[in-house]
Amino acid sequence: MFQGILLVIDGKIKKITENENPLYENGIDLKGKYVVPGFIDAHIHGAYGADAMDGTVEALKTISSFVVKHGTTNFLATTLTSTKEILKNVLEKIAEVQNKELEGANIFGAHMEGPYFDIQYKGAQNEKYMKPAGIEEIKEYLNIKPGLVKLFSLSPKDDAALEAIKFLKENGVIVSVGHSAVYFDDVQKAIKAGLSHSTHTYNGMRGFTHREPGVVGAVLSSDAVMAEVIFDKIHVHPEAVRLMLKAKGVDKVECITDAMSATGLPDGNYKLGELDVYVKDNQARLVSNDALAGSVLTLDKAFKNVIELGYSIFDAVKMTSTNAAKEFGLNTGEIAEGKDADLVVLNNDYSVDMTFVRGKLKYQA
């Protein structure tokens, strides 16, 4: 951490000067504030009344405009388990706006959450669309636009799933374990096949016991796996987050929101895909069985929660930005010369004051 000047030209960090030189012409004086890399959310379904599964460009733009107010500069629009036809339509809409300048955060691709899951750990996914993995179907998703699908969550429950993992990895897609009833040894086989990510770790997966470490044990013990966590203090107890960080280190944990359409809106009744959800006391739950149904979290809150747990601002930056940037090969996530100028200006209480995407001011409090 230092005081100095950031020179941004054509959307990139051109020069960093570590001193108190006078401001450049058209400069912004941020004295007394923090400047950190923009947050990256690899798992978000919706916000402010919009859901990626709405299948419209307008919905995606609404999510983009909302999350930028909370410091997110890049995100993966995330799908839900559904029919092949609906999923292809949603992916086509995401493809239209992928890496195109929007009023808010950049959408750098799609995260397909499903449909190859286990009903036992369905969470808020619709079980009627769950099915075994199939490479021919996956090809249809990937053929919509090369490089669109960046992350694919599935359960590595059989040989078909293992073949799908190999195929996805060969095609540049990161594969994640999620909504899965498999055992420790099954995840180990999946890691050997190319799996390297864990979807909202602890949630929607076989838990840890001393006789069967489960999916959780496999994720915590593997250096090859990047672990997502919904750090809203609701989905995961703070001490379980600390345990994860002790097991994996701050370089292998990513804060995600798993936010749904009610994020940013008052308590009330909403939809998550086709399922009815109610929101109360910062919790989104299914009307049918009271199960947690995504979150109403924003990454600025997750950033604060990391610091409140006793970790440094540097660790919080890694978990909300740098780790995801490295995992997905993005030219951002660090304040360094040559990097994209995706930046968040924070006040002393870590609230968002300004957000810059590719050097352009997209939000100011």
Predicted regions and their residues:
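Histidine-rich, glycine-flanked metal-binding segment
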Residues: 1-36
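Conserved, mostly hydrophobic/aromatic
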Residues: 32, 43, 67, 112, ...
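Divalent metal-dependent hydrolysis catalytic cores, especially in the metallo-beta-lactamase
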Residues: 45, 61-90, 105-118, 145-157, ...
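Charged helix-capping and loop-helix junction motifs
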Residues: 56-59, 90-93, 134-136, 210-216
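Active-site gating loops and adjacent loop-to-helix segments of metal-dependent hydrolytic enzymes
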Residues: 65-76, 119-146, 189-201, 212-226, ...
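Active-site core of metal-dependent hydrolases
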Residues: 139, 143-265
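His/Asp/Glu-enriched, well-ordered alpha-helical/loop segment
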Residues: 217-229, 233, 245-257, 263-346
